[in-house]
Amino acid sequence: MKQNSAKFIVIEGLEGAGKSSAIALVRDFIEKHNGVPPVCTREPGGTPLAERIRDLVKIADPNDPLCDESECLLIYAARAQLVANVIKPALAQGNWVLGDRHNLSSLAYQGGGRQLMPLVEAVSQATLKDFKPDLTLYLDIDPQLGLQRARDRGALDRIEQQALSFFERARATYLQLAARDESIVVIDASQTMAQVHKEILAVLQRQDWS
């Protein structure tokens, strides 16, 4: 595989959209395409420091509640660490990278959900500049259905416990951003898993991976 052929693919979506199964599908596709598995990451997280930040963001501390601005800045600190120490080095070595969330999550969740878009855009530009995925698959689902699926999995984390209106704003932002960026493909995640996977494979197969 040529070094300049390495791609960065990201799976995005609200809680309960089916990201985990989609990631497994795309990972298998990449491994069959390249003969080697991709480097898999998750956000926030993916490095020892970023995983510690993940715990701060995901686990509520009733004695020291995390304010919205701190949440945003912590997530970008984790992302900057991951991009610098894992994603960019992997791509430079010719390895494909498959991400469970990336910057689009912050634009949707902190920018739309928390209504902090000016802060998110400023920090995004400062930390990432023009770095972005080659392809993002956004699994779109009605927030009520997604949250019910998340509840069925078990206890909800701090982010998953946010009000329905938070996720409605996040979804609206996801769709607005997807409408103006051709590298973001919207997949209807309310379908059966088989239908969702069929759509994902169709998207992957029609990409120019040269």
From Swiss-Prot:
Function (record text): Phosphorylation of dTMP to form dTDP in both de novo and salvage pathways of dTTP synthesis.
UniProt keyword annotation of Kinase present: yes
Recorded family membership: Belongs to the thymidylate kinase family.
Keywords annotated in UniProt: ATP-binding, Kinase, Nucleotide biosynthesis, Nucleotide-binding, Transferase
Protein name: Thymidylate kinase
PROSITE patterns, per database record: THYMIDYLATE_KINASE (PS01331)
Catalytic activity: dTMP + ATP = dTDP + ADP
EC number: 2.7.4.9
